[in-house]
Amino acid sequence: MEQPVGQPAYVLHSRAYKETSALVDFFTPQGRVRAVLRRARGKGGSLVRPFVPLEVELRGRSELKNVGRLDSMGIAAWLHGDALFSGLYLNELLMRLLPAEAPQPELFEHYALTLQALAAGRPLEPLLRSFEWRLLEDLGYAFALDHDVSDEPIEADGLYRLQVDAGLERVYLVQPGLFNGAELLALAQADWDAPGALLAAKRLMRQALAVHLGPKPLVSRELFRKR
Protein backbone atom coordinates (compact mmCIF):
# COMPACT_ATOMS: atom_id res chain seq x y z
CA MET A 1 0.00 0.00 0.00
CA GLU A 2 1.33 3.42 -0.95
CA GLN A 3 2.24 5.47 2.12
CA PRO A 4 1.12 9.11 2.40
CA VAL A 5 3.90 11.59 1.73
CA GLY A 6 4.27 14.90 3.54
CA GLN A 7 4.04 18.06 1.45
CA PRO A 8 4.52 21.77 2.15
CA ALA A 9 1.34 23.65 2.95
CA TYR A 10 -0.23 26.82 4.28
CA VAL A 11 -3.61 27.16 5.96
CA LEU A 12 -6.06 29.25 3.95
CA HIS A 13 -9.08 28.82 6.20
CA SER A 14 -10.30 26.68 9.08
CA ARG A 15 -13.46 26.22 11.08
CA ALA A 16 -14.74 23.99 13.85
CA TYR A 17 -16.02 20.61 12.72
CA LYS A 18 -18.03 18.32 14.97
CA GLU A 19 -16.99 18.32 18.63
CA THR A 20 -13.19 18.30 18.66
CA SER A 21 -12.15 18.51 15.01
CA ALA A 22 -11.46 21.27 12.50
CA LEU A 23 -12.19 21.48 8.80
CA VAL A 24 -9.09 22.99 7.21
CA ASP A 25 -8.45 24.30 3.71
CA PHE A 26 -4.76 23.96 2.86
CA PHE A 27 -2.85 25.45 -0.04
CA THR A 28 -0.18 23.01 -1.23
CA PRO A 29 1.82 22.56 -4.44
CA GLN A 30 -0.94 20.09 -5.37
CA GLY A 31 -3.53 22.83 -5.07
CA ARG A 32 -6.26 23.65 -2.58
CA VAL A 33 -7.09 20.66 -0.40
CA ARG A 34 -9.74 20.33 2.31
CA ALA A 35 -9.09 18.00 5.22
CA VAL A 36 -10.36 17.07 8.66
CA LEU A 37 -7.94 17.64 11.53
CA ARG A 38 -8.97 15.51 14.48
CA ARG A 39 -8.17 16.52 18.06
CA ALA A 40 -7.86 20.11 16.85
CA ARG A 41 -7.35 21.36 20.40
CA GLY A 42 -4.03 19.53 20.64
CA LYS A 43 -0.57 20.33 19.27
CA GLY A 44 -1.66 20.15 15.63
CA GLY A 45 -4.49 22.59 16.22
CA SER A 46 -2.07 25.26 17.44
CA LEU A 47 -0.46 25.23 13.98
CA VAL A 48 -3.74 25.76 12.13
CA ARG A 49 -3.41 29.47 11.47
CA PRO A 50 -2.55 31.52 8.40
CA PHE A 51 0.94 32.23 7.13
CA VAL A 52 2.69 29.38 8.98
CA PRO A 53 4.84 27.17 6.69
CA LEU A 54 3.76 23.59 7.36
CA GLU A 55 4.35 20.05 6.27
CA VAL A 56 1.11 18.10 6.10
CA GLU A 57 0.50 14.42 5.47
CA LEU A 58 -2.95 13.83 4.01
CA ARG A 59 -4.77 10.52 3.94
CA GLY A 60 -7.76 9.36 1.94
CA ARG A 61 -8.83 9.28 -1.68
CA SER A 62 -12.03 11.31 -1.46
CA GLU A 63 -12.11 15.08 -1.90
CA LEU A 64 -12.31 15.46 1.89
CA LYS A 65 -9.00 14.20 3.28
CA ASN A 66 -7.83 13.42 6.80
CA VAL A 67 -4.75 15.02 8.31
CA GLY A 68 -2.36 12.24 9.26
CA ARG A 69 0.46 14.50 10.39
CA LEU A 70 1.01 18.24 10.68
CA ASP A 71 4.36 19.88 11.50
CA SER A 72 5.79 23.38 11.41
CA MET A 73 8.42 23.83 8.72
CA GLY A 74 9.82 27.23 9.63
CA ILE A 75 9.08 30.63 11.04
CA ALA A 76 5.65 32.07 10.36
CA ALA A 77 5.39 35.21 8.26
CA TRP A 78 4.61 37.80 10.95
CA LEU A 79 2.13 40.14 9.28
CA HIS A 80 0.55 43.16 10.91
CA GLY A 81 -1.34 46.26 9.85
CA ASP A 82 -1.98 46.57 6.12
CA ALA A 83 0.34 43.63 5.41
CA LEU A 84 -1.98 41.40 7.48
CA PHE A 85 -5.04 42.53 5.54
CA SER A 86 -3.09 41.92 2.32
CA GLY A 87 -2.23 38.37 3.38
CA LEU A 88 -5.86 37.68 4.25
CA TYR A 89 -6.83 39.04 0.83
CA LEU A 90 -4.48 36.59 -0.90
CA ASN A 91 -5.96 33.72 1.11
CA GLU A 92 -9.49 34.73 0.22
CA LEU A 93 -8.63 34.94 -3.48
CA LEU A 94 -7.20 31.42 -3.36
CA MET A 95 -10.22 30.10 -1.47
CA ARG A 96 -12.65 31.66 -3.94
CA LEU A 97 -10.84 30.97 -7.21
CA LEU A 98 -8.71 27.84 -6.90
CA PRO A 99 -10.40 24.61 -7.97
CA ALA A 100 -9.96 21.72 -5.56
CA GLU A 101 -6.85 19.57 -5.99
CA ALA A 102 -5.58 21.25 -9.17
CA PRO A 103 -1.75 21.26 -8.93
CA GLN A 104 -0.28 24.77 -8.71
CA PRO A 105 3.41 24.35 -7.74
CA GLU A 106 4.60 27.66 -9.23
CA LEU A 107 1.71 29.62 -7.74
CA PHE A 108 2.45 28.01 -4.36
CA GLU A 109 6.06 29.19 -4.55
CA HIS A 110 4.94 32.69 -5.57
CA TYR A 111 2.55 32.77 -2.62
CA ALA A 112 5.28 31.77 -0.15
CA LEU A 113 7.63 34.44 -1.52
CA THR A 114 4.88 37.06 -1.39
CA LEU A 115 4.24 36.31 2.29
CA GLN A 116 7.95 36.71 3.01
CA ALA A 117 8.01 40.03 1.15
CA LEU A 118 4.94 41.28 3.03
CA ALA A 119 6.56 40.34 6.34
CA ALA A 120 9.73 42.19 5.30
CA GLY A 121 7.78 45.41 4.80
CA ARG A 122 8.05 45.60 1.01
CA PRO A 123 5.58 47.98 -0.72
CA LEU A 124 2.19 46.30 -0.80
CA GLU A 125 0.72 47.35 -4.13
CA PRO A 126 3.34 45.80 -6.47
CA LEU A 127 3.24 42.56 -4.46
CA LEU A 128 -0.55 42.31 -4.62
CA ARG A 129 -0.77 43.17 -8.30
CA SER A 130 1.98 40.68 -9.19
CA PHE A 131 0.22 37.93 -7.26
CA GLU A 132 -3.17 38.70 -8.81
CA TRP A 133 -1.64 38.55 -12.28
CA ARG A 134 0.15 35.28 -11.52
CA LEU A 135 -3.12 33.82 -10.25
CA LEU A 136 -4.92 34.83 -13.45
CA GLU A 137 -2.12 33.30 -15.52
CA ASP A 138 -2.12 29.99 -13.66
CA LEU A 139 -5.90 29.70 -13.86
CA GLY A 140 -5.87 30.39 -17.61
CA TYR A 141 -7.61 33.77 -17.34
CA ALA A 142 -4.70 36.03 -18.31
CA PHE A 143 -4.55 38.20 -21.44
CA ALA A 144 -1.86 40.04 -23.38
CA LEU A 145 -0.78 43.43 -22.08
CA ASP A 146 1.25 44.43 -25.12
CA HIS A 147 -1.24 43.44 -27.86
CA ASP A 148 -4.96 44.07 -28.24
CA VAL A 149 -7.72 41.62 -29.18
CA SER A 150 -6.94 42.21 -32.87
CA ASP A 151 -3.29 41.25 -32.21
CA GLU A 152 -2.20 44.82 -32.88
CA PRO A 153 0.56 46.25 -30.65
CA ILE A 154 -0.67 48.41 -27.79
CA GLU A 155 -0.08 52.06 -28.72
CA ALA A 156 1.18 54.35 -25.97
CA ASP A 157 -1.29 57.09 -26.95
CA GLY A 158 -4.24 54.72 -27.43
CA LEU A 159 -7.25 54.07 -25.19
CA TYR A 160 -8.31 50.53 -24.32
CA ARG A 161 -11.04 48.70 -22.47
CA LEU A 162 -10.88 45.20 -21.05
CA GLN A 163 -13.03 42.46 -22.48
CA VAL A 164 -12.52 39.90 -19.74
CA ASP A 165 -13.07 36.89 -21.97
CA ALA A 166 -10.88 38.20 -24.81
CA GLY A 167 -8.39 40.89 -23.82
CA LEU A 168 -7.81 44.57 -24.43
CA GLU A 169 -9.84 46.32 -27.12
CA ARG A 170 -8.86 49.67 -28.56
CA VAL A 171 -11.58 52.32 -28.41
CA TYR A 172 -11.76 55.84 -29.76
CA LEU A 173 -14.42 57.43 -27.56
CA VAL A 174 -13.77 58.32 -23.95
CA GLN A 175 -15.85 56.25 -21.52
CA PRO A 176 -15.55 55.08 -17.90
CA GLY A 177 -13.07 52.35 -17.02
CA LEU A 178 -10.59 52.84 -19.86
CA PHE A 179 -6.82 52.36 -19.74
CA ASN A 180 -4.27 54.34 -21.67
CA GLY A 181 -1.69 52.48 -23.68
CA ALA A 182 1.32 53.93 -21.87
CA GLU A 183 0.03 52.49 -18.58
CA LEU A 184 -0.58 49.08 -20.13
CA LEU A 185 2.90 48.97 -21.64
CA ALA A 186 4.35 49.81 -18.21
CA LEU A 187 2.35 46.94 -16.71
CA ALA A 188 3.63 44.57 -19.38
CA GLN A 189 7.15 45.37 -18.15
CA ALA A 190 6.14 45.39 -14.46
CA ASP A 191 7.43 48.97 -14.33
CA TRP A 192 5.72 50.05 -11.12
CA ASP A 193 7.54 53.39 -11.08
CA ALA A 194 5.90 54.58 -14.31
CA PRO A 195 3.32 57.35 -13.79
CA GLY A 196 -0.12 55.89 -13.15
CA ALA A 197 1.05 52.28 -13.37
CA LEU A 198 0.04 51.14 -9.89
CA LEU A 199 -3.40 52.74 -10.04
CA ALA A 200 -4.01 51.32 -13.52
CA ALA A 201 -2.88 47.87 -12.36
CA LYS A 202 -5.29 47.96 -9.44
CA ARG A 203 -8.22 48.92 -11.69
CA LEU A 204 -7.26 46.35 -14.31
CA MET A 205 -6.91 43.48 -11.83
CA ARG A 206 -10.18 44.40 -10.17
CA GLN A 207 -11.98 44.29 -13.51
CA ALA A 208 -10.27 41.04 -14.51
CA LEU A 209 -11.03 39.28 -11.23
CA ALA A 210 -14.58 40.53 -10.74
CA VAL A 211 -16.20 38.23 -13.28
CA HIS A 212 -14.56 35.17 -11.72
CA LEU A 213 -15.25 36.19 -8.11
CA GLY A 214 -18.93 36.84 -8.73
CA PRO A 215 -21.17 39.28 -6.84
CA LYS A 216 -20.30 38.17 -3.29
CA PRO A 217 -18.05 40.85 -1.71
CA LEU A 218 -14.58 39.93 -0.49
CA VAL A 219 -14.55 39.93 3.31
CA SER A 220 -10.88 40.92 3.42
CA ARG A 221 -11.56 43.95 1.23
CA GLU A 222 -14.34 45.09 3.56
CA LEU A 223 -12.08 44.64 6.58
CA PHE A 224 -9.39 46.72 4.89
CA ARG A 225 -11.85 49.54 4.24
CA LYS A 226 -12.97 49.54 7.89
CA ARG A 227 -9.48 49.41 9.41
UniProtKB/Swiss-Prot annotation:
Q: Which gene encodes it?
A: recO
The protein's name: DNA repair protein RecO
Protein keywords: DNA damage, DNA recombination, DNA repair
Q: Which GO terms describe its biological process?
A: DNA recombination; double-strand break repair
Would you say which domain of life the source belongs to? Bacteria
UniProt keyword annotation of DNA damage present: yes
Describe the task this protein carries out.
Involved in DNA repair and RecF pathway recombination.
Looking up HAMAP family in the UniProt record yields: RecO
* Gene Ontology terms: cellular component: bacterial nucleoid
**Per UniProt, what is one Pfam family of this protein?**
RecO_C
To which protein family does this belong?
Answer: Belongs to the RecO family.
